[in-house]
Amino acid sequence: MAGTHTLHVATRKGLFTIRREGRGWQIGEPDFLGDNVSAVLSDPRDGALYAALDHGHFGPKLHRRAPGAEGWEEVMTPAFPPKPDGVEDVDPMSRRPIPWTVMRIWCLEAGPRNRPGELWCGTIPGGLFQSHDAGRKWELIRSLWDNPGRKQWFGCGGDFPGIHSICLDQRDGRKIAVAVSSGGIWTTEDRGATWACRGKGMRTSLVPPERAHDPGIQAVHLL
């Protein structure tokens, strides 16, 4: 949603903008026609628009359209650091090695109003990234990536786990919550210095019964 009269819809066939005109809605010319748009963000702070593309074999791309601009510019795509030698990182269900490579940008979120240019990004595999300059540079939040609880996350509907929801508390910028499929809900109250898994009371049917209530492996779909 971009304002009260405009919708931006990301689809496998492009990015569609739908505007309210009179008593009806009008679909404009699509952007990135024929491309898989995996995420879209309309920044409520300045009106910039961000679109993440999933090019399959050729990898993800991220584009930004400045407020009032006609065209798009490609900005930096988040990237993992090289995987250290000797580190074992596998999906606990499939036993497949988890690549330290961004396969898909799954969600984008704007930072607080008092921090212009701050963006957050969730990826497959389950990385959380932050940018301070409108997507020109990205930093992996190592405190979550290196958390021992991440080793329990597994792919649900995809080959690998991923972060699909990021919620920032606009009243307190230190508080952030992210949701993982499948890996539960994780929250921080110190801007990512430390994380806690929140999911007591949830239940999943994707694992053996004795682990159904484990908060760290819940198949959260949206937050």
Please report, for each region that a protein language model flagged, where it lies by residue.
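Extracellular glycan-interacting surfaces
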Residues: M1-L223
